[in-house]
Swiss-Prot record:
Coiled coil: none
Organism of derivation: Buchnera aphidicola subsp. Schizaphis graminum (strain Sg)
Topological type in the membrane: Peripheral membrane protein
Single GO MF descriptor: cytoskeletal motor activity
Protein name as catalogued: Flagellar motor switch protein FliM
Subcellular location: Cell inner membrane; Bacterial flagellum basal body
Keyword terms: Bacterial flagellum, Cell inner membrane, Cell membrane, Chemotaxis, Flagellar rotation, Membrane
Database matches in Pfam families: FliM, FliMN_C
Organism placement in taxonomy: Bacteria, Pseudomonadati, Pseudomonadota, Gammaproteobacteria, Enterobacterales
Length: 311
């Protein structure tokens, strides 16, 4: 089913964002999660078109985009090989991928060297990647990562790192992992030439699984006062507030130093980025503290209670 997502303006040209989503996508994402994904993709399209247009000094237009599950492209049957970039989502220790159409890099390279891309008509891929392709690929992947992470920041923070670049055969099974991936496929038009890229992210990135194991001191009153218990798994409750305290990982000073402390003295903290997060004075997990977009953010690294592990 095709949906028109409204009009946006880029480089004084108006275009419609047309997208098609897999019919069974609602088996994996609820309506709120799908809306979140649509907003992220819309922002990404606007950002990446501006970046690509500036990079190759030429107009680029979106044809359409699709959202599917565990696919490389909009229609995998049309291709034998793709350029593949393996990525790592550092905050969650999960993999992600970016795939390019067989003509993607050659068209960009032709534009960058003064051509119009129309000399590139083949849709196959050479077995070996050239040095120029490596350099241009890494530059473009950097653009995509920055644009996608920036598009996500209104909903969540992700830190994506480049891992590897190679060529894959689509007739071989690639998804060996148990993770489900959302395939965000974007078809573009450069000077009449169709190219595409696909961004694959784990479904768990979009899923809102912020479930906690808690119990109430008074089960008849919804209160902020909560204590942690081992066997009560909250799944469908909302509007629950927990008192969260963030503490620095303990550092140590000598008794002599302590006895001689004066106002204005400086105390060295061994690792100020490391913190312990507590609820009702009970340590819950270890994390890293960072400042992002003028906000304090804690990255969860390790639960301190085995029953709090994700299920």
């Amino acid at each position: 089913m095709l949906h028109t997502m409204g009009k946006s303006t880029n480089l004084d040209n108006e275009y419609k964002i047309i997208y098609k989503r897999e019919k069974n996508l609602d088996r994996f994402l609820d309506q709120n999660e799908m809306k979140k994904l649509e907003k992220i993709n819309k922002k990404f399209i606007q950002k990446i078109i501006m970046i690509f247009s500036s990079f190759i000094k030429s107009n680029i237009e979106l044809n359409f985009y699709t959202v599917k599950i565990n696919s490389y492209t909009n229609d995998d049957k049309n291709f034998k090989h793709l350029y593949a970039n393996s990525l790592k989502i550092e905050t969650l220790e999960k993999k992600s991928f970016i795939f390019f159409s067989p003509n993607f890099l050659s068209v960009f390279i032709d534009f960058l060297f003064g051509g119009k891309g129309n000399s590139i008509i083949r849709m196959d891929i050479k077995k070996e990647i050239t040095y120029t392709e490596h350099v241009i690929n890494k530059k473009i992947v950097g653009f995509i990562i920055d644009a996608y992470c920036e598009s996500c920041k209104d909903f969540f923070y992700i830190d994506i790192k480049f891992l590897d670049f190679n060529i894959i055969k689509l007739n071989k099974h690639f998804f060996y992992t148990n993770d489900l991936f959302i395939t965000n496929y974007f078809s573009f038009n450069l000077n009449g030439i169709k190219i595409f890229l696909s961004i694959l992210i784990p479904v768990s990135i979009i899923k809102e699984k912020n479930k906690k194991i808690i119990n109430f001191l008074d089960k008849n009153i919804f209160s902020k006062k909560t204590i942690l218990k081992e066997n009560f798994f909250i799944e469908n409750l909302s509007n629950i507030e927990l008192d969260v305290t963030v503490e620095l990982i303990p550092s140590y000073i000598s008794k002599h130093t302590f006895d001689n402390l004066r106002e204005g003295d400086v105390i060295t903290i061994e690792d100020p980025g490391k913190v312990t997060v507590c609820i009702e004075k009970k340590p819950i997990f270890l994390g890293k503290h960072k400042i992002f977009d003028e906000k304090s953010i804690i990255f969860l690294e390790k639960f301190l209670h085995q029953n709090l592990e994700k299920k």
